[in-house]
Amino acid sequence: ADIVNDVWALRQPGTAQVVARHPACGICLMHMHRDPQTMQSAPMEGDAVLQVLSFLKRAALDLQALGVNRQRIVLDYGIGFGKTVEQNFALLARQDELLAMGYPLLAGWSRKSSLGAVTGLDVDQRLIPSVTAALLAVERGAHVVRVHDVRETVQALAVWKAMRSEGL
């Protein structure tokens, strides 16, 4: 394996053993409020950014306490996993606060319902909103973006990078 994608961020039994069996791979820790069955029916309350920040910081430190080098850790703020539309957009707007922890950040906005909420588009029509969100996440410092439409996102990022390097 190249990466362990832990959507439970060490909250499931056996996770530490899986990580230990793969000492050369990266570990992505994602924030998910509650569990898949209840996360959307009872989303987070209050300042989601501060709660996600605290949760991910604790999970990353717990992983390091197990002997995992911090350079192997990537954090994912878990768009759509128990958060309201407003909270999801607040996480993007305040992504710099998450980056201040010093870990690479993954943003997974592709086809998310929050994009549908602001555009009115069905999931299979969210290409442009998804690419737009990926570009904004990268511009705001995300190191990795999780996408469905790889070719289109790569093309958009190439144009964005060229425009930034030329000062346009």
Question: How should each PLM-predicted stretch be described?
Answer:
Residues D2-D62, L66, G82-L168:
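Active-site-adjacent loop and "lid" segments of alpha/beta metabolic enzymes
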Residues I79:
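Acidic/histidine-rich catalytic cores of soluble enzymes
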Residues N69-R72:
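Short acidic capping loops at alpha-helix termini that bridge into adjacent secondary structure
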